[in-house]
Amino acid sequence: MVAEKPKTLTSLEGDDKLNSNFVRDEDERPKVAYNEFSNDIPVISLAGIDGEKRGEICRKIVEACEDWGIFQVVDHGVGDDLIADMTRLAREFFALPAEEKLRFDMSGGKKGGFIVSSHLQGEVVQDWREIVTYFSYPTNSRDYTRWPDKPEGWIKVTEEYSNKLMTLACTLLGVLSEAMGLELEALTKACVDMDQKIVVNYYPKCPQPDLTLGLKRHTDPGTITLLLQDQVGGLQATRDGGKTWITVQPVPGAFVVNLGDHGHFLSNGRFKNADHQAVVNSECSRLSIATFQNPSPDATVYPLAIREGENSIMEEPITFADLYRRKMAKDLEIARHKRLAKEEMPFKELDEAKFESKSIDQILA
């Protein structure tokens, strides 16, 4: 019998055994501890990026994108006080009673708000996390009724944080554009009217962290992601298809930059799309704030620069909406096969499994 899916992870506090909804297959379980840190991911200072150090900084970023698709940046222009406020208010939200958090429940296709694990329907196993999602750009599409009004002041701080992260993202996209031999704003223009989504992840203490994940292995669909994480540790990356993993060393005040699928395709595969996951632990909770910089749904996805002797890695141009739908459909197909294997579902039942048609706004929720 399948256990009922919890509406908050707070309701599971004190359990000494992991709820069966969160138990991963053995091949998906963590292979490296949350605090077994690696220094393989470079930490790059952006100080002087608009001056004489620009060439050196660009070289380091390009090397990281070609090697891992992940790097960390410091001296990025986002103030320490703003980072501290955003982090503090986020933790205060997740400490609220369940009924307060569930006022912003985003299940059922709502655009933004609070949910446990993931917005995707059809997932076999849940991720051990609670999240709050903000759709922050374009600014005229912000729905403040879906932005939590507690703790007091979080909306204002999130607005400022969103604006600063948009500026930082455009700076980094300019570097990558130059590296591809294009004009400074080439990647930003390829996004058309750039979307931004902020996802605040809270990973509570877990009774059996060796059996689950905070966030399953994936690549991000968009252009780049800027991740602010606390000092606990849990972000992991692989560059050999999951054979070996490293845990990214947290750096105070740094942003981890992940290249996404869109950035990978625009570079014709030159820049890797970061293959990563999040693990949890039984000692303490962890907080991270991911800011996803995505192209608009109707933006064309196709390599912007194809080097001599290379062919395009894409057969034809498609829209970002179509790219994302294909990615989601593939993920859900894998999930269905896993469910079939675990529950021995009849093929007829598998064919009739619920798969709702969603708008791109709901898909990117």
From Swiss-Prot:
MF-aspect GO terms: flavanone 3-dioxygenase activity; L-ascorbic acid binding; metal ion binding
Entry cofactors: Fe(2+); L-ascorbate
Limits of the Fe2OG dioxygenase domain: 191-295
UniProt-listed Enzyme Commission number(s): 1.14.11.9
Amino acids binding Fe cation: 218, 220, 276
SUPFAM superfamilies noted in UniProt: Clavaminate synthase-like
Cofactor note: Binds 1 Fe(2+) ion per subunit.
Function in brief: Catalyzes the 3-beta-hydroxylation of 2S-flavanones to 2R,3R-dihydroflavonols which are intermediates in the biosynthesis of flavonols, anthocyanidins, catechins and proanthocyanidins in plants.
Pathway: Secondary metabolite biosynthesis; flavonoid biosynthesis
GO biological process, one term: flavonoid biosynthetic process
Superkingdom of this protein's organism: Eukaryota
InterPro entries: DIOX_N, IPNS-like_FE2OG_OXY, IPNS-like_sf, Oxoglu/Fe-dep_dioxygenase_dom, Plant_2OG-oxidoreductases
Keyword field: Dioxygenase, Flavonoid biosynthesis, Iron, Metal-binding, Oxidoreductase, Vitamin C
Similarity comment: family membership: Belongs to the iron/ascorbate-dependent oxidoreductase family.
Protein name as annotated: Naringenin,2-oxoglutarate 3-dioxygenase
